[in-house]
Every structure is written in C-alpha cells, then in structure tokens.
C-alpha cells in the first residue's frame, strides 16, 4: 500500500524542476549558447541548486547530460553521412578540438574512426559505441 501511495503522490518541486530542465535540454541541446547558467535562468533557480537537484535525480551532472545528448546527435549525424565537422557544429559543440577529445574519451575512438567502422559494417550502426 505504501508503494501505491508513493506512485500517486504529486511530484515534488525539485523533481518538477529537473523534469523541466531535462525537457528544455532535450529540445535545445543543439544551441551552442546553452549553458548551465542559461538553463538555471530558464528554470528560475540558481546554478548551484539546479546542479545539485539534477545530479540527485539523474545521477549525472547537467553538463554531462548535455554532452551525452550532443554526442548522440553527432553519432546519428555521422551515421547519416554528415562530415565530422558538420556533425560537431550541428550538435551544438563550439570547440572542435574539445569535441574530438570528448568523443574519443567517451567512445574510445575518433569520430573519423567511428565513421569508417560504420562504412565497413553498416548493419552495426545502432550497436556501435
């Protein structure tokens, strides 16, 4: 019975804040000017409070979540045939060198190596890193 009550309880203000932040990030992650500060302004809260609440509910930092959204977009763009630079720019990254380092750090290969893997094994597009 306690579990049933917990499921029907209205969301807390903090979880609503995080849900609003996640929805905004998902809708605007390609904006190169999107920052934790601009997200905090959008949600009418401080950067510190937003960062703490976000990490508590998602187990990930705002920056990490945004980076992952952008990387997923970039991988889809590369798989669709975009150049690495175009995929980087279309994904909201502002620094190409930083993007390359982050991609390699997350996936263990460069974006060009990823593209080459896709060309060799197109049936693995959705199962690659």
Predicted ranges, named:
Residues 36-69, 88-113:
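Basic/polar phosphate-binding segments, predominantly the helix-turn-helix DNA-binding elements
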Residues 66-75, 113-127:
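Short, basic, alpha-helical segments at the C-terminal edge of helix-turn-helix-like DNA-binding modules
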Residues 16-24, 66, 70-73:
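Pre-recognition alpha-helix immediately N-terminal to the DNA-recognition helix
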Residues 13-16, 99, 128:
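Compositionally biased regions
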Residues 1-7, 20-34, 54, 58, ...:
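Basic, amphipathic alpha-helical hairpins
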Residues 1-9, 13-16, 20-23, 41, ...:
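An amphipathic alpha-helical interaction segment
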Residues 11-15, 33, 81, 93:
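Short, solvent-exposed loop/helix junctions and linker helices
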């Amino acid at each position: 019975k306690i579990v049933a009550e917990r499921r029907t309880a209205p969301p807390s203000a903090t979880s609503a804040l995080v849900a609003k932040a996640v929805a905004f990030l998902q809708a605007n992650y390609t904006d190169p000017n999107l920052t934790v500060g601009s997200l905090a302004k959008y949600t009418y809260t401080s950067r510190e409070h937003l960062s703490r609440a976000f990490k508590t509910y998602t187990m990930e930092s705002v920056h990490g979540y945004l980076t992952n959204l952008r990387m997923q977009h970039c991988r889809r763009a590369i798989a669709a045939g975009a150049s690495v630079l175009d995929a980087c720019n279309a994904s909201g990254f502002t620094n190409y060198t930083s993007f390359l380092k982050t991609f390699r750090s997350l996936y263990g290969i460069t974006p060009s190596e990823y593209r080459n893997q896709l060309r060799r094994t197109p049936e693995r597009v959705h199962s690659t890193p």
